[in-house]
């Protein structure tokens, strides 16, 4: 059965070569069900996303100074001001299976969502210890959606062995695991991510004379959208138009991403040959090493996640804003003149630490963008953010010390009112990060017990 045919609770617009899942529209409910639900609140689905930031944080500029609800955001967390009452800053959480090893980055990324011991290996025989929490949630929350989970990133997956640690780089390229030995593949191209959700693929078929892939998805399904508008009420029509406008905006941004031809023209034949040998696209190399501003690309991925949650085509997503030990050049940010990983090894130089803070803040700005977008979309008596749990974190505290203790962790949203929010909470030292994951599982009604190295839930967070 075509995976898209699973969708029944929400409408799908269709056209030749594309389909577009829609948000929940009460006007489309059968009259009998609509009558039964009169006076009752539509039960919105829960969503979960995890955003990963590599290379840790500036330790002195991350944590708010006050605990409880009356806390002031730290300099790095300032971009979250608009959603402060809908988020949690959590301190003291540690990933013990990360610090029982001398490796600095890769194992601390590979087990970020598994909280299990990572096997040291130099080849593709990887083992992250077990399934990641997003995949547990995908089996629970995502079993009724078209795509049980989505995995996105900004950096291409890396293979080979890290010379300084003698461990495979594969661990640094994924946080999502179907099982300990099976990492989930990621999409790093916004166009491919968008098309995978909203275009129909027909393997082995020749392109149609009028290739639908050259058309806007919205243009393809517009006739169906116009027919639907005649069947729904004014409120739902406004909701539909808001959603379709968002789709159109993303398509335009995908088509208008900045050209990298100038960088390509400056690449020497020797470098071009080496890039071909390494099988890396020229524009990708330039983007990573030449300080190209990737903010819009990063936010395109965010907007695609928002569309997926909004339309209920998926309820679970992970998004890596960089691979472990990412050396992306962040000189597109004012005040930064070097690569992320190099700056994270700041040696307590005030100039380096100032740049480190700027890079950290950029990552939080992308997280804040996601939370604000979700919070802007009404759903039932609340918003998409209210019905979500959006994790942000890194696998280590400080890039200089590589410590996976007192990890930088934020959670946005209450999971449909299951979590208390609006506080800065600090737990006893070495409280397992897995206790947060066990808490999130409990908030969704999952019956999974003893996730990772958890010793219980963070019961003070549960409503």
Model-derived features: positions:
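Ligand-binding pockets and gating/stacking loops
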Residues: 1-463
């Amino acid at each position: 059965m075509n995976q898209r045919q699973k969708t029944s609770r929400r409408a799908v617009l269709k056209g030749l070569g594309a389909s577009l899942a829609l948000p929940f529209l009460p006007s489309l409910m059968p009259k009998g069900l609509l009558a039964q639900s009169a006076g009752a609140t539509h039960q919105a689905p829960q969503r979960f996303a995890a955003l990963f930031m590599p290379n840790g944080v500036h330790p002195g500029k991350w944590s708010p100074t006050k605990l409880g609800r009356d806390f002031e955001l730290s300099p790095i967390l300032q971009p979250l001001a608009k959603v402060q009452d809908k988020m949690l800053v959590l301190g003291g959480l540690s990933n013990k299976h990360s610090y029982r090893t001398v490796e600095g980055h890769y194992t601390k990324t590979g087990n970020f969502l598994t909280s299990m011991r990572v096997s040291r290996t130099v080849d593709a025989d990887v083992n992250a210890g077990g399934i990641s929490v997003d995949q547990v949630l995908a089996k629970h929350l995502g079993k009724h959606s078209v795509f049980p989970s989505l995995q996105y990133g900004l950096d291409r997956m890396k293979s080979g062995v890290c010379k300084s640690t003698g461990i495979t780089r594969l661990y640094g390229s994924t946080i999502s695991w179907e099982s300990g030995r099976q990492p989930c593949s990621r999409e790093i191209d916004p166009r491919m991510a968008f098309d995978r959700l909203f275009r129909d693929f027909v393997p082995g078929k020749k392109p149609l004379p009028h290739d639908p892939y050259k058309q806007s998805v919205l243009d393809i399904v517009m006739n169906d959208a116009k027919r639907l508008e005649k069947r729904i009420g004014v409120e739902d029509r406004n909701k539909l138009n808001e959603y379709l406008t968002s789709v159109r905006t993303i398509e335009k941004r995908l088509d208008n991403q900045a050209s990298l031809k100038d960088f390509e023209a400056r690449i020497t034949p020797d470098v071009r040959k080496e890039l071909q040998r390494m099988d890396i696209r020229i524009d990708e190399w330039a983007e990573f090493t030449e300080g190209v501003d990737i903010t819009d690309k990063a936010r395109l991925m965010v907007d695609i996640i928002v569309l997926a949650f909004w339309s209920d085509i998926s309820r679970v997503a992970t998004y890596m804003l960089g691979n472990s030990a990412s050396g992306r050049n962040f000189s597109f940010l004012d005040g930064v003149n070097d690569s992320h990983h190099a700056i994270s090894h700041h040696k307590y130089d005030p100039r380096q630490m100032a740049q480190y803070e700027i890079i950290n803040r950029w990552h939080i700005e992308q997280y804040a963008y996601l939370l604000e977008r979700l919070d802007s979309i009404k759903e039932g008596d609340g918003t998409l953010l209210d019905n979500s749990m959006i994790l942000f974190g890194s696998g280590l505290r400080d890039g200089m010390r590589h410590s996976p203790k007192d990890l930088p962790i934020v959670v946005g949203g209450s999971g449909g009112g299951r979590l208390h929010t609006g506080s800065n909470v600090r737990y006893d030292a070495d409280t397992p990060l897995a206790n947060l994951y066990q808490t999130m599982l409990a908030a969704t009604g999952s019956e999974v017990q003893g996730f990772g190295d958890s010793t219980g839930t963070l019961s003070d967070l549960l409503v």
